[in-house]
């Protein structure tokens, strides 16, 4: 995307970010609402109010009908809305985008849904004059819910594009993306394994689920129950995750945990057949394996890039805290008040701490066993310097010799060596005879036998 927020292409992208996911949700909700009214042979009075209420319900805004509050909204639509917002904002943001363009993208992702929320509130207020049982929700609660959902999606989308660049320019540690990736892996593992447990429990309680489907005789009614069960399946998975980590989930007075179950009335929703019934069998204690396996996934993700001890532990703690915060947020969004049944949700006082302790404890053990802690290289000890011995000094005599040679050269220049007197021949005189060394035989004494005279000549 170009850094200039003007032009046809930029305006089209910003419009897609602002209204794309919200308009798609409105179209789907309108189609389902009109289909329901047509099948029920009902008139279209208040259809717009129902559509607006359902759109706000996607953003976890409670709906009040006839004095009864429906605060437990399905998690699947809100998760799809977060995913759609993250996808559109990521597509409109490039890794090289300036902060000016990024601010425009985030503002569009928040401004468009808030505008639709204001219109929906006005439509509901107008429809409540016709449908007296429909009540207008709190405006602050409605706008806050819409802002929260789209802010989470925009943060995920923009962070995926420029998060690493922002982190490089900040003083924060460089292992933060790895910690967030490990937290996402832990959350997906915990929720996914809880879903497997939920499906297994539905198979075990198949007869109970069949009885819940029997409350309606029409095919369309059973189809509607199936759709509702699919929409509320993530809520049940989050409750199963709370039970798996040692916390508890409750539907009104009915409370469920891995150690005990207190019975009570539950809504006639087929997916709720997965909840255990008292007395609790010992097999449910095996749910703790789900928490341990999810913690192993966190530790393995943190061990992908080994770090020294303290940074490795810091990365694991950040990952565990992020995962605990995400699960707590899912538990809060998936709960609420359900009419006469009372409050539905998880125990928030123990859910997030339990997730954190599982991920830190088992995750640290996995981190150490998987080689995620890098050992610091040992510092090479310098070799000891040998002390100089008196008889092994080699350089000093050479320096002295050089100095002696320099002194001798200076003395030689100052005092030239004496030259022997050489006799110079004078004109007219014969050259002097060369001096030869004396013959040693001249000094020998030989006995005279009379054959030679004193001059060395033979006698006659």
Language model features: what each stretch is:
Residues 6-31, 95-110, 138-144, 174-191, ...:
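Alpha-helical transmembrane segments and their helix-start/interface "positive-inside/aromatic belt" motifs
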Residues 96-132, 185-197, 267-287, 309-342:
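Hydrophobic alpha-helical transmembrane segments of integral membrane proteins
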Residues 94, 135, 139-143, 205-227, ...:
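Hydrophobic alpha-helical transmembrane segments and immediately flanking/interface helices
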Residues 26-42, 68-73, 100-119, 145-156, ...:
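Alpha-helical transmembrane segments of integral membrane proteins, especially early/N-terminal helices
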Residues 192-208:
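Alpha-helical transmembrane segments and their membrane-interface junctions
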Residues 2-14, 83-103, 122, 153-183, ...:
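Cytoplasmic membrane-interface segments at the C-terminal ends of transmembrane helices
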Residues 2-83, 124-131, 215-287, 332-357, ...:
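Long, glycine/tryptophan/cysteine-rich extracytoplasmic
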Residues 62-110:
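Membrane helical hairpin/interfacial module
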